[in-house]
């Protein structure tokens, strides 16, 4: 047969133009494509041999071999898979919409497709070789046939096919690399090894690298032994019952890169309309870059044991960015470059599954290893809280995972919402909480009445807590109540109610005087029912921005943050307030006391003083007067 010259299909010519101009973001991926195609061919031969044993003689080792020749700038990938005949070469390499694998699946539509292990659902990866090769030769012999063929192209608009002797079934692809530094790099032994181990380390068949012969001291050529490059086990593909705990921990060190042990993990295999595997780890320590906006996060994505990408963010929400692990899909379609995911539906289903498994693993740790979970929460709980304002699907699961300090917990101990509700005393209707500065919130004057009543208050001091509580409005049938806002509805005796009403009238004059002096800073002055030992405190109106939110927005550099006027509550039983009431009734000047009370209320809640010098001067005058 004479050499036949043929033209590529129009779509192929367009594809070649894209490839030559680097459609892929990373040129090294061409080798991943060739190895994947070789694995396809091996799968086909193995499968067809089940019905025709002559296609795979006993003892045949299905494998992939890689050779380099630096002097000739050649890279060769050989497999002993199904091979191709002339028609296959024209249809598979001359057109784009009819990949060999695609036709193979179509021909088997009435058979058990689940037994066919195929990856080549894209049909265009082969052409990526022209990013690095100026010429390509494909020498092949199809299983069950005797005539071999040679396909040749320089990546222009044409290709040639000729008959060529070949004794071994399979395909040998030779790349004549371009005369540029990037392309020549693909004859480097370490480079080839690195790429194969990175992308194809878990491929089912052995991938063997053959080093170039080197001269010894005598000038004689020495042939080095071949080296298998993919000796790793796809742990996530194994049954969970067959994997030991130490194996899980060792694999975490491979993918986690933090040198520690995971807090817990989840290993699953989903079957049905979609089939995929996942092995996800929850680290015990926060990654060093957990708060960097541009930090990479996500899972490693594989398709048919072929590595596709690191840090696949589509499989995890930002509030689970600390999770490490692997997802492998049987059904995930990828675009031409295999780097950008196409099917949102499939990705969404996998994502939902992974999120559920992570939350289940955390809940299991919380239920069975409470101390361990407490330690984990202190490391990464603040990230998990982001889930309350970033999603609406998993709020119930997240609520059960929350942990808080409270007025009833010892130092270092935390309480869950379940525990809080179970130990609520009779008469308590709501879940009370207070947000503030970490050092000040524990001694905030607003806690005094709650402690006296025996009501536990959750204490929050993370910057994200304000955002979280905007979505966290109830737990079961219990609503949350911020004790720094509005009135507190305590159950009161008739005598207590009468005393409160009486105090409003008795202290009306003092409240009005304080309001006049502090009018620029204070919305209202009123008698408090929440104070026991302190003279005063600041309360936020139900419709106003909290002091904590105001401070946080200013710290974030937001300009023109509106100043919220607060409510100053005074304690009618405190000696200072009694003394000031007497002054007000006697029409005496309150002097520096209003500024002193306001400043004390600010400091007690952890807020900064608007004018520290003025406050110090007022306190100094009062102390000096008391010393005389």
What kind of feature is each model-predicted range?
Residues 1-186, 194:
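GHKL (Bergerat-fold) ATPase N-terminal catalytic module, capturing the glycine-rich phosphate-binding loop
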Residues 118, 139-158, 178-185, 190-628:
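GHKL/Bergerat-fold ATPase module in large chromosome/replication-associated machines
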